[in-house]
């Protein structure tokens, strides 16, 4: 899977990295700091298909970041924590293709420091629940069979009922997750697209059907689940495709148990949009005109976005999703 594996030299003899390297079975290349090489020169995003390198490093600087408005449900503070850079999947709309200078993966291993910062943040908000989201810069489950950090974050939730951790994912890699007990404040949230859309643009990801099967398995075992319909992309038979997706979820009794469902229409920064045009010139992402929007992102016009999200919201309500659990993600007046 990996072309080369780089490890920061001060981490080589640590137990966590030794365990990780034994699973990878790859001779590491030592370096002082991962950013001596990573991102120093432009590596085209699609080169990940042939030569994907792995860097194992210590995350320095800010370990938690305050999430922007409309990132999660309103009323409580939301942060995201950075456990990795880049993703093994290849979704045509992914903003990472214009965010970093390289698609190579970085896995950060200083989870105890991240958890300490979480604890400090929790103490700074003594009367509130505080949300911590994983999956902003990398899928939160895809490589957990290698990294083995889930138990640490699970224990943090067990010991801190006011903390809510959300693992955002498109993965069906739940091997490590199934070793843990369900907790109400340890939420696994799945990004889902209608089957036709997923096949067209969620490249190298588990299918929508596979994700639904995993959600069903986790639900049967009592795990807390949520879903993201984000990005919502317009295409012919748009309404029918979301009806079919929600019916599939309803058949598995998933719609009524969701902690929440977020709805967000496809959007890009200007730089990411240029990369998408370059990397996927024939994508259905380009089939509907977009404009520069309220936050300088490239999106469909406002009436169209509202119509799309309200259409999907009505379908979700009909399928049994709780109205107070549905919110609009990264949208004005959300």
Q: Where on the chain are the PLM-derived regions?
A:
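Flexible, acidic/Gly-rich N-terminal and inter-domain linker regions that tether
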Residues: 1-77
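Auxiliary Fe-S-binding modules of radical SAM enzymes
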Residues: 1-17, 247-334
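Structural preference for beta-strand elements that scaffold enzyme active sites
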Residues: 4, 129-133, 164-166, 185-189, ...
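Conserved Radical SAM active-site core
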Residues: 57-77, 92, 96-189
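Cysteine-centered iron-sulfur cluster-binding motifs in ferredoxin-type domains/subunits
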Residues: 81-91
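Structured alpha-helical segments in the cores of large, soluble enzyme domains
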Residues: 118-124, 176-181, 208-221, 312
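Conserved radical SAM core fold
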Residues: 138-141, 172-175, 186-206, 231-235, ...
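Active-site glycine- and acidic-residue-rich loops that bind
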Residues: 166-167, 234-247
């Amino acid at each position: 899977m990996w072309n080369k594996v780089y490890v920061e030299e001060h981490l080589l003899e640590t137990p966590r990295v030794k365990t990780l390297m034994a699973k990878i079975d790859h001779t590491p290349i030592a370096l002082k700091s991962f950013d001596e090489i990573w991102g120093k020169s432009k590596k085209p995003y699609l080169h990940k298909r042939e030569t994907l390198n792995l860097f194992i490093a210590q995350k320095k600087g800010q370990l938690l970041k305050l999430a922007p408005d409309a990132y999660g449900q309103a009323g409580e503070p939301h942060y995201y924590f950075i456990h990795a850079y880049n993703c093994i999947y290849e979704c045509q709309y992914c903003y990472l293709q214009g965010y970093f200078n390289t698609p190579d993966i970085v896995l950060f291993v200083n989870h105890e420091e991240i958890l300490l910062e979480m604890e400090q943040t929790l103490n700074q908000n003594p009367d509130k629940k505080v949300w911590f989201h994983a999956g902003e810069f990398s899928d939160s489950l895809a490589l957990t069979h290698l990294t083995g950090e889930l138990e640490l974050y699970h224990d943090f939730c067990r010991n801190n009922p006011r903390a809510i951790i959300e693992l955002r994912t498109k993965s069906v890699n739940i091997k490590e997750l199934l070793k843990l007990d369900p907790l109400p404040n340890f939420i696994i949230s799945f990004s889902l697209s209608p089957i036709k859309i997923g096949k067209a643009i969620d490249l190298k990801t588990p299918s929508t059907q596979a994700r639904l099967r995993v959600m069903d398995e986790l639900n049967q075992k009592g795990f807390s689940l949520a879903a993201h319909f984000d990005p919502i992309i317009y295409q012919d038979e748009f309404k029918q495709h979301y009806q079919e997706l929600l019916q599939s979820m309803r058949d598995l009794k998933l719609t009524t148990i969701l902690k929440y469902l977020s709805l967000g229409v496809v959007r890009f920064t200007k730089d990411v949009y240029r990369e998408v045009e370059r990397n996927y010139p024939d994508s259905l992402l380009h089939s509907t005109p977009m404009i520069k929007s309220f936050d300088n992102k490239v999106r469909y016009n406002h009436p169209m976005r509202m119509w799309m999200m309200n259409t999907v919201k009505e379908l979700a309500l009909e399928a049994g999703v709780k109205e107070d659990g549905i919110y609009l993600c990264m949208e004005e007046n959300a």
